[in-house]
């Protein structure tokens, strides 16, 4: 009897917690204009359209890559495999350099966008989730409400901001 009561309370608590997890997002209308072929086994973490090509960062340990993809056919034109113990994440382009985050490995890989050759790497404190280039800076998300802004050439941290909805931080930014 005690176990059943306990499980009932736990179920109710879980349900209430899930219901109060946050406000629903706004619905926005959309229209699918075109569908392009894509490797369904690729665990896409970052995607950039540049010079008529797609550059894609894929994740999963032992399977993470940086790919150059023909958007018309879905064919992978070139591919760089990451070390097996690295999980690829977000991808951004700045000054013909591709920057690829790693999830928990504390690294940012830098590639020449013309050749996909590795031209460097930088340490990254914390987890890497999403990456964007904006106004000459790289913006990193780490799954929290915080965004970190970096100078691309040296990957020096120049600012941090907390994203809020009113007075509440918005968690799980990617």
What are the roles of these predicted feature ranges?
Residues 16-18:
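C-terminal motif of bacterial Sec signal peptides marking the signal peptidase cleavage site
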Residues 22-41, 71-77:
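A short helix->beta-strand "capping" segment at the edge of beta-propeller domains
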Residues 33-65, 79-92:
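Beta-strand-rich domains and repeat architectures in extracellular enzymes and scaffolds
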Residues 35-40, 79-84, 120-126, 161-171:
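Surface loop/turn motifs at the tips and blade-to-blade linkers of beta-strand repeat domains
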Residues 42-46, 86-93, 126-134, 169-174:
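Repeated scaffold domains used in trafficking and secretory/extracellular systems
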Residues 51-52, 95-96, 135-137:
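Short coil/turn segments that connect the beta-strands within blades of beta-propeller domains
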Residues 55-61, 98-105, 140-144:
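Conserved beta-strand positions in repeat-built beta-propeller and related beta-rich domains
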Residues 69-74, 112-116, 151-155:
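Short loop/turn segments that connect beta-strands within beta-propeller blades
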